[in-house]
Amino acid sequence: VAGLAASCSSGTTAASTTTGPRSTTTTSATSASGLPPIRHVFIIILENEGYDVTFGSPASDPYLASTLPAEGALLTNYYAIGHFSNDNYVALISGQAPNPLNQSDCIHFVNFPPTATVAANGQISDSGCIFPTSVTTLPNQLTQAHLTWKGYMQDMGNIPSRESPVCGHAPIGQPDQTEKAVPGDGYAARHDPFVYFHSIIDDTAYCDAHVVPLGTTTGAMPAGTPAGTTGLAADLKAIKTTPNFSFITPNLCYDGHDSPCINQQGSASPLVNIDTFLQTWVPLITSSPAFKKDGLLEVTFDEADTDNGNPADATACCNEIPGPAAAQPGVTGPGGGRVGTVLISPFIKKGTVSTAPYNHFSTLATIEDLFGLPKLGQARTVTSTFDRDIFTNPG
């Protein structure tokens, strides 16, 4: 497969059980008291499945549903923060709440209106897609703290006339040409949160160096990729080349979004395609020097959804607060639904199960705690972060 380029609205209670670029390891940023010394965080984000489908029994994705939880922690009450895709991706790196345009997946690559202002908790007051430079992101924080990051986007640049091989996005004001996969290219800009912030894309060299193709497991990159640009497989070979924060987005086939896949590279089952991607890339990550030293891998889903015409799950948790532009983050409800998440780390006992409530803002807040960074947006107000309930192994 080398070529694979607090309380919830449902009322759940919290409990935990157990069974059985250049990376900087010494920096001015320090983790919050009581947290393990994690210095390399990896996120793989998948598409459109609720907890009962993904982690149900029997599951069509046994690697994700059974194998990976046995290696780390299963968070059974982890929630997305909105519908549809783009607002969840954006939230993970900025703490920004959904607004009507990114709830609709930003089919046009447009700015916020110039009249938009900053409201409580750093939220932008209007509706738009590309956030103004006044909105700080996790990548901006990491750079300021002399820590490193990269977004690895599968298929980006496979067809250079569709999107650039690095920092791929439409011209401002134009339609997004990546809304649907085409033969040979399943990159979707709406699943690449970094290109929705002027604080990243306005510095072309900065964005080009940090938002790159995933590449293959052998290190091959799409034709036209700038010389010297490396993908995940190459970066994982040494601690010094592994970013402190890695955000990994599969293409529209292997993230489980499309079924069947237009490129006919996957199964008719989105869950089988998800398992194929994870079986290919997770062992590469968990066997890397950086992960074994001080790593944390999160595998999660953008939102809960169904493919049979039923309304999407729009439940929420963790004191999720609507932003100023959208009263219902989940369009029909207060959130993005229950999706579940798996965490793997040397600092997590194998077989841990947590029923505590978490969401995407919990993820952002935890990463900021680990790296000693201020909280952004709704990471300030979320009621739960990953702590001793999760990090059950002293290492």
Per-range role (PLM):
Residues 11-12, 20-395:
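N-terminal pro-sequences and low-complexity stem/linker regions of secreted or lumenal proteins
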